[in-house]
Structure formats: C-alpha cells, structure tokens
Amino acid sequence: VRAVRDMFFPGKGKVVASVPWCTFTDPELAHAGMTEAEARAQHGDDVDVWRQDLAHNDRARADGTTAGAIIVITHKKRIVGAHILAPAAGEMIHELALAIEEGVGLSELSQFTHVYPTVSTSIGRLAGEAAFEKAGRLSWLVKRR
C-alpha cells in the first residue's frame, strides 16, 4: 500500500522531520526531529528539554570520552526532537528517530533495556530520570494520610 501511495503521491509516505542525520566529526553530532526553537515556535511553552551529559556514562568515562551530551525535546510527553553529541552518535540516533516517528514518550523509552556498558545507556538514563521527574511533578495528586 505504501509503495503505491508513494508512486502516485511522492513525498507523502515519509515524515521528513524524523529522518536522522549525522555529522561525522569527533565526537559525532546527530539529530532527528525538531530543535528546541522549532518546538517552541510550534508548541509554545508546552515543551520540555531533557539533557544527559556523557560525564555520567560509565563507558564514556572508561574510554575517556566524556565530552558530549544527549538532548531530547518533548511535547505532551511525546519525543519531538533529539540531538546527540557523542562518539557513535550516528549509531545511537536511530532509536530516538524511531521514537519520534512512532510517537513514543520518554516513559515508554525508559522501559527499553540498553546493553551495559555502552554510551547508549545514557538514552535510557535520560528517559528514566525524565519519567521519574514527571511523576514527581504529579505528587500533589496523591493524598497523604
């Protein structure tokens, strides 16, 4: 069905915004989806930006490559943009590009198991910390005895 649709309506089948790209520098710079500025222009202040520095990653520390970070932009709990500055960022961005395309949120992404120790465990750590922080923001809903 997609092949026929794309044949008659080229460009309609793929969401170009979620297509990842990478600049192969040292460290690599990879991106998918919206930048923070684009997300704020489209969604206003209903945007959250989450950051995980590689200084907290065991593999990066072991390799001596702690310069870098993973940044994820969300709107209404869904990932709308991702940026990675890290060794092998071009290999790690695919997970976040798929999350953008499929409308996955950080809480769902936090359930994914990453191989340890790899730099990509920082994606899981970012997702877990973001989900935990979001849950903490709702703690006022819970009645205490």
In which residue ranges do the predicted regions lie?
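Conserved core segment of the aminotransferase class I/II
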Residues: 1-5
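Flexible, glycine-rich terminal cap/loop adjacent to redox cofactors
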Residues: 6-8, 12, 19, 24-145
